[in-house]
Amino acid sequence: MKGLKDKVIIVTGGAGGIGSATCKRLAEEGAKVAVFDMNLEAAKTLVAEIEANNGQAIAIECDITDRQIVDSAVKSTQEQLGPIDALVNNAGWDVFKPFLKTSANEWEKLIQINLIGMLNMHHAVLPVMVERNHGRVVNIASDAARVGSSGEAVYAACKGGLLSFSKTLAREHSRNNITFNVICPGPTDTALLAGVTEGASNPEKLREAFTRAIPLGRLGQPDDLASAITFFLSDDAGFVTGQVLSVSGGLTMNG
């Protein structure tokens, strides 16, 4: 895709699943990738794989819920790679249970990771983009935010907030030539989905139910999401902002 060579791009939750696939794809497109993750060893392993394929990446240990750590991670990225061109807010966490069976501690963790962490990243990175009058932001939400999902009430609330937040920033920063778009994954074959299914009485049956519900007949793969994310970051999407794209194999449709 056009315009990604030598661009400095941060990917949060970059060491696994959708994040890992996105980092690899961006490196293949010639971008300089900062892999932000709490699991530094996993991030380093991914960076080594990217470098072995002639890509450029760095591993940064980052807890997005801690603003001081975020600021330090952003500073380190710019010292090593240069000014930040784009941000992918991919880090997330979920707990799968009916709302009345959740606890206040679980609400707090869900909100801190899925909402506050994302706010921290935007607040730390956007000034760089505003100063340069250019930037791309892709936020990873969920189809749970668009249509609801039983057992994910607080997660869906956080991701729904991310949709509105992204559209608002798309308006506020259009004059700064910064685009904001949102990807809503459907059921995707990642560790997050595995965590959801493992909590069921029959995990394999639940996976099969997810698969049957998808018109294209399979679970999403991380590479499916990486392709959509890469498009929104590229010059090919230069006239696209404030949009929400479901990547779900047709599980949810709108128009």
Regions found by a protein language model. Name each.
Residues H122, C158, S166:
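Active-site helix of classical SDR
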Residues L100, V147-A153, R175-N176, G217, ...:
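Active-site loop immediately N-terminal to the catalytic Tyr-X3-Lys motif
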Residues V147, T230, T241-G255:
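Short C-terminal tail/terminal secondary-structure segment
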